[in-house]
């Protein structure tokens, strides 16, 4: 909204210096600062409110260190969503389809997560929202994003095709399969971030690193000169995603102020599902979905550990009559907790791994 207001003021009065409003880098920085200020100013008030209403229940099977985390409020994802949405609406071109698709994804899955958290911590319903209803919400969002982009002729030509990472000469045309692909990616990534949200700061920090790389990809994809030089698909409007991405990064960093160990608040499913859907939708819109195993590497590894654990347990139970486990506990971060690693050490090492994976994904820009 501020973009349109300041553009109008510039058109009428032409004050010096206001031309910076046309620069994506300026608005991305402004969006980041705005999101961070919102978190730091309103965060304590939101935490005080949540502390009286919604205390996170601790699972009996959780590691010993985790069971000490009592009387800590959840639903902190509300402050993340507030910061991103307000900042995005202020600084991005809200008329761009990419902008409202990302903002919609965050609100949509944030609402699904909110219902789940509310049922668990307020209504005391064990398990919260049924898994099938979460899947319905994820599939519906994927269908909206995939369907809109596929049937919009101006977007379909660009988004239904992609290049293979490390081999840019090979182009894949998804065709109608772009819609089920969008559904799968939205569902998989939002669940992956949800699984990763088990240690103080792990999901927020990993998301900040992941989305920061997506911000870079979005900026390059939306700039015709850079896209041509790097031999990547130029997508008009993708640059606006940079602004939202930086708002997400700043919101996650601001949330770490309160969520770093020892945490004062948890993001809950409200935050993890919202952030996961944002990562998925941004990757889809800027054609980096095939790079997600690197860009969202920690989330991918955490999910893989759960799949391997459950699959091996079922296989050995069927084969031997007794289920066996590969990891001491899944997701993987709990395995290291069981081994006696300090929570801060696990989180920081996972962040380092995520940085290395993101840097690897950035190498694809120069590979022909």
UniProtKB/Swiss-Prot annotation:
Organism placement in taxonomy: Bacteria, Pseudomonadati, Chlorobiota, Chlorobiia, Chlorobiales
Family matches, as Pfam families: Glycos_transf_4
Matching InterPro entries: Glycosyl_transferase_4, PNAcMuramoyl-5peptid_Trfase, PNAcMuramoyl-5peptid_Trfase_CS
GO molecular function: metal ion binding; phospho-N-acetylmuramoyl-pentapeptide-transferase activity; UDP-N-acetylmuramoyl-L-alanyl-D-glutamyl-meso-2,6-diaminopimelyl-D-alanyl-D-alanine:undecaprenyl-phosphate transferase activity
Organism field: Chloroherpeton thalassium (strain ATCC 35110 / GB-78)
Associated pathway: Cell wall biogenesis; peptidoglycan biosynthesis
EC number(s) reported in the record: 2.7.8.13
Location of this chain's protein in the cell: Cell inner membrane
Keyword Transmembrane: yes
Function: Catalyzes the initial step of the lipid cycle reactions in the biosynthesis of the cell wall peptidoglycan: transfers peptidoglycan precursor phospho-MurNAc-pentapeptide from UDP-MurNAc-pentapeptide onto the lipid carrier undecaprenyl phosphate, yielding undecaprenyl-pyrophosphoryl-MurNAc-pentapeptide, known as lipid I.
Record's protein name: Phospho-N-acetylmuramoyl-pentapeptide-transferase
Cofactors named for this entry: Mg(2+)
